[in-house]
C-alpha cells in the first residue's frame, strides 16, 4: 500500500544522499543503477539472471545537508517492530554493523585477547499481527486484563479497495490507549477511521448494557470516555487512495473509512459480546464503574464550587 505520495519517498532519499545504489531483481534479471546527489552516474545496467524478486537500496546521507548522518538503532528498532506488527507475517531484520565506540578506560592492552566483533541484530515477525501488538502493549502495563483473550478481527472490501484490522483488550487500568494507522502510517491525530471506531464502540456497548439490564432505565448512557477507560486498541486501515490532512499525514480524511470501520466494528463487537457473556459483563461493569466515578467527581466539584460561593457571599 502507498502512503499517499507515490514514489516521492525514494526520490527524496536520492536527492538528499551523497550516493545511492539501486539493485532491482525482476523479469528474471538483476538491474543496477547508481546516483550521486540525485543524478544518475550511469544508465540502468542489466546484470545476471535470477529467479527471485526484490529491491536493495543503499544510500549515504549527504553531510552537507544534514547536521548529523548518524542513524539511531533504537529509533529504527521501534519503527521496524511497529511495521512488523502492522504487516502480519512480515519478517524484518535490522542489523547494525557499526563498530561501537569504546571508552578510554575500556581500551585493552596489546597482550589482552579481544573478542570478535559481532554486529547488533534484531528480527521481528508476528504471525498474529495486531493481536500480538495489543498483547505486547498490555504486557508492559502494571494493570491486569479484564478478559484473557484479545478481541481481534479483520475485514476487506475489494470493490472499495479498503481493508480493516482491529485488535483490542480492556485492562483494569484507567488510561485509554487507542492507536490508529492508515496504510501503516501512525495517524496519531486520528481521523475518520478512529471516528468510526469510537462511534461503533460506544453505540454497541450501550445497546448491550441496556439489553442485558446492566444499565437501569433511569441511568444515563455510558460516555465514550467511560467505555474506553483501560482499553488498549489498535485500528489499522488500508486504502487504495488514502487522503491525509496535511503533509505530515497524521490524520486520515477519507469519508468512506468512517462508515466502513463503524459497520465492521459494530458487527464484530456485537458478535463477541453475545458469544462471551461473562467477559462482556466484566467489560460493561468496568465502564459503569468509570461512569459512577465520573459522576461522583462532578458532584464533588459542584459541591465545592457551591461552598465557595456561599463563603464568598457570606
Regions found by a protein language model. Give the residues of each.
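GHKL-family ATPase ATP-binding module
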Residues: 1-3, 7, 11-15, 19-314
Amino acid at each position: 500500500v502507498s502512503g499517499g505520495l507515490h514514489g516521492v519517498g525514494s526520490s527524496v532519499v536520492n536527492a538528499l544522499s551523497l550516493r545511492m545504489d539501486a539493485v532491482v531483481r525482476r523479469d528474471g534479471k538483476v538491474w543496477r543503477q547508481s546516483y550521486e546527489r540525485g543524478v544518475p552516474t550511469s544508465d540502468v545496467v542489466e546484470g545476471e539472471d535470477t529467479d527471485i524478486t526484490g529491491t536493495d537500496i543503499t544510500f549515504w546521507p549527504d553531510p552537507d545537508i544534514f547536521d548529523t548522518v548518524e542513524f539511531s538503532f533504537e529509533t529504527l528498532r521501534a519503527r521496524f517492530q511497529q511495521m512488523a506488527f502492522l504487516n502480519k507475517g512480515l519478517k524484518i531484520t535490522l542489523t547494525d554493523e557499526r563498530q561501537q565506540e569504546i571508552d578510554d578506560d575500556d581500551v585493552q592492552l596489546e597482550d589482552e585477547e579481544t573478542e570478535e566483533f559481532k554486529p547488533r541484530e534484531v528480527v521481528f515477525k508476528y504471525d498474529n499481527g495486531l493481536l500480538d501488538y495489543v498483547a505486547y502493549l498490555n504486557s508492559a502495563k502494571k494493570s491486569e486484563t479484564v478478559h484473557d483473550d484479545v478481541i481481534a478481527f479483520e475485514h476487506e472490501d475489494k470493490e472499495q479497495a479498503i481493508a480493516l484490522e482491529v485488535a483490542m483488550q480492556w485492562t483494569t487500568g484507567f488510561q485509554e490507549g487507542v492507536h490508529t494507522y492508515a496504510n501503516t502510517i501512525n495517524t496519531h491525530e486520528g481521523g475518520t477511521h478512529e471516528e468510526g471506531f469510537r462511534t461503533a464502540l460506544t453505540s454497541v456497548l450501550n445497546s448491550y448494557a441496556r439489553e442485558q439490564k446492566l444499565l437501569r432505565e433511569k441511568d444515563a448512557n455510558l460516555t465514550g470516555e467511560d467505555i474506553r477507560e483501560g482499553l488498549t486498541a489498535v485500528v489499522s486501515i488500508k486504502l487504495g487512495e488514502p487522503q491525509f490532512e496535511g503533509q505530515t499525514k497524521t490524520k486520515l480524511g477519507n469519508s468512506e473509512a468512517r462508515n466502513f470501520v463503524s459497520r465492521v466494528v459494530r458487527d464484530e463487537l456485537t458478535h463477541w459480546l453475545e458469544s462471551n457473556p461473562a467477559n462482556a459483563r466484566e467489560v460493561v461493569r468496568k465502564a459503569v464503574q468509570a461512569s459512577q466515578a465520573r459522576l461522583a467527581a462532578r458532584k464533588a466539584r459542584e459541591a465545592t464550587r457551591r461552598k465557595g460561593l456561599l463563603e464568598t457571599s457570606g
